[in-house]
Structures are given as structure tokens and as C-alpha cells.
Amino acid sequence: MIRLLFLLLSFYISSQTDQNSKEHTLVLEIPNIETAGIIYIAVYDNAEDFDSGDDSREIMAYNIIEPVSKEIYQKKIILKEGDYAVKVLIDTNNNGDIDLNFFGLPKEQFGFSNNVLGLFGAPKFDKASFKLNENKKIIIKLR
């Protein structure tokens, strides 16, 4: 009897673990790249890291850095089920920085998931986040 209970408990725990680690395909599409450069995509899975302003790769759930041309950009990535928010920057002069104009606004194209903007800077996670609980495609329009 104890063996049967142990076996049932083990099966239940393993089935819960499988449900919590479901993976889905996220397709990121960026349709309006105006100038070729290096694309920086940062995917975050929590508000603390997204809202921190810290762009170190260690705190990102996923990141992409690669050359991009003036075409529609699409990338498929596999992520665990959960809530995510995405930041995108096109570095057109390849200096690794967000270049700002006199008013402190970015000179280079940028965007966020849900196509939201913050009032004075990046939007908060709760505005930019989306739930990934099935395969999904999101379109981020750059500004």
C-alpha cells in the first residue's frame, strides 16, 4: 500500500513539473526597420529586471544581438510558459549605445512589446508584458 501511494505521489509531482515547464514558440516580428544596423532584443520574464534599467544579459530571459537589414525582421524563440516583456533597439552606428538627441529622446529606432511607450523613458513591465501560454506572434513597431 505504501509503495502504491509513493508511486502515485511521484507520478503526480512529475505531471505538475511537466505542466509548469511547458514551452511555446514566440515569433517576434518587426516590420518597419528604416536603417540597417545591429538589432538588440531583450526579453524579460519579471517586472523587477525589466523596470530596473539594467541591460546586462544575465537578468534577461532571452536576448538577441545580430545584424539586421531594412527588411521585415522575424525571429522564432522558444520560451517557457509565463509573462514576458520585450525591448528592441536598432543600433545604426554600431556603437553599442542608445544615442540621444538634445531633448534626451533616442535618435535610433526602438520599441517595446504591446507597442507601448513610457511617459519619460521605457514603459513599465505591467504595460509591456504579455502572457505566453500558447504559440504566439507579436509585432513590435519601432519608433
Language-model features: locations:
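Surface-exposed loops/turns
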Residues: T35, K80-G82
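Hydrophobic beta-strand positions
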Residues: V43, L89-D91
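Acidic, glycine-anchored loop motifs typical of Ca2+
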Residues: D91-D99
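A short tyrosine-centered beta-strand micro-motif
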Residues: G82-V88
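Primarily secretory-pathway and cell-envelope proteins
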Residues: Q16-A47, G53-D55, L100-R143
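Bacterial Sec-dependent N-terminal signal peptides
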Residues: M1-K22
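Tryptophan-paired
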Residues: D54-I78
